[in-house]
């Protein structure tokens, strides 16, 4: 295993500075036998590892709770996203995602060392983008990348319609520079992006245009508008937006949180969300969604929040 050894050298020693802190296992790289060296002094582990900086080179790769393709998917790594590897065993790498700190296992074959891959400059902004062999939509297709994937783009083609990316070309209408900001107002872009995904299959752990869960949808469309968001709905509830006053009407782009669920308003009455009831991304009256949650919860709506 071509990594810095787990215990950072034979003579490395670490001392806990007081009691171990409480931690969220979803975003804390601690496995019992091994932990990120950044946790040394905060949490005990028999060994600590310096993360190896890797990057997803596959179109996408599921992040799993345990090594093995039959284990539960907990999130998804998209092309061009960073993954910090702490251990490799067989075909699986254990570590955490660079964009949100989520911890899990991904297939080794989906990763390359970041030194061997160009730094991404653009995001796939369409539901999916094709990488063509030539700057011509009639040419052969090299690969298909989902919404949210990151690529390194170079100079424009002579016609101005394509950007060079690796050995291929991507249409300019399908990408935007990383970090592009969107102003949140009554016509904000989050809802328009979500509407592109109507009919996309519900996929537990998914966060791409090919399949996604409720919080994956919210995280991805916010990322595309230049806003960092955590992975799960409870994490998003804690940090995103401001509470909307009771009695104030909802508007396009507002977030509504339910028990273990989140959706985005497309107007004052209707919500778009990836849901397991319809097993896809759908638009429906907010009242219908609330009625379903009211069957199993005394508090079907946890919060209504507005991004600013």
Residue ranges and their predicted role:
Residues 80, 142-153, 252-253:
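Loop/turn positions that initiate beta-strands
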Residues 72-73, 140-141, 240, 246:
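Short, conserved secondary-structure segments in the cores of folded domains
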Residues 293-308:
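Low-complexity, Gly/Ser/Thr/Pro-rich intrinsically disordered linker/tail segments
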């Amino acid at each position: 295993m071509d990594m810095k050894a787990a215990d950072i050298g034979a003579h490395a020693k670490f001392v806990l500075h007081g009691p171990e802190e409480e931690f969220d296992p979803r975003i804390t790289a601690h496995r019992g036998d091994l932990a990120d060296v950044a946790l040394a002094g905060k949490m005990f582990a028999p060994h600590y590892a310096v993360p190896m900086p890797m990057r997803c080179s596959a179109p996408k790769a599921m992040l799993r709770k345990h090594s093995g393709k039959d284990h539960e998917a907990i999130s998804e790594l998209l092309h061009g996203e960073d993954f910090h590897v702490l251990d490799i065993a067989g075909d699986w790498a254990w570590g955490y995602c660079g964009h949100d700190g989520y911890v899990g296992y991904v297939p080794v074959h989906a990763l390359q060392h970041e030194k061997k891959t160009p730094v991404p400059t653009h995001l796939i902004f369409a539901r999916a983008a094709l990488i063509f062999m030539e700057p011509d939509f009639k040419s052969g297709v090299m690969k298909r990348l989902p919404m949210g994937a990151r690529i390194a783009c170079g100079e424009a083609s002579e016609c101005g319609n394509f950007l060079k990316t690796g050995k291929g070309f991507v249409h300019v209408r399908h990408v935007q520079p990383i970090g592009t900001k969107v102003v949140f107002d009554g016509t904000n872009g989050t809802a328009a992006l979500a509407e592109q995904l109507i009919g996309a299959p519900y996929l537990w752990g998914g966060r791409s245009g090919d399949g996604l869960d409720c919080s994956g949808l919210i995280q991805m469309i916010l990322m595309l508008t230049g806003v960092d968001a955590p992975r799960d709905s409870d994490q998003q509830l804690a940090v995103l937006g401001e509470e909307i006053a009771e009695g104030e009407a909802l508007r396009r782009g507002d977030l509504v949180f339910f028990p273990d669920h989140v959706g985005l308003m497309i107007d004052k009455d209707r919500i778009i969300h990836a849901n397991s009831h319809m097993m896809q991304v759908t638009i429906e009256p907010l009242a219908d969604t609330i009625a379903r949650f009211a069957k199993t919860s005394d508090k079907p709506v946890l919060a209504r929040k507005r991004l600013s």
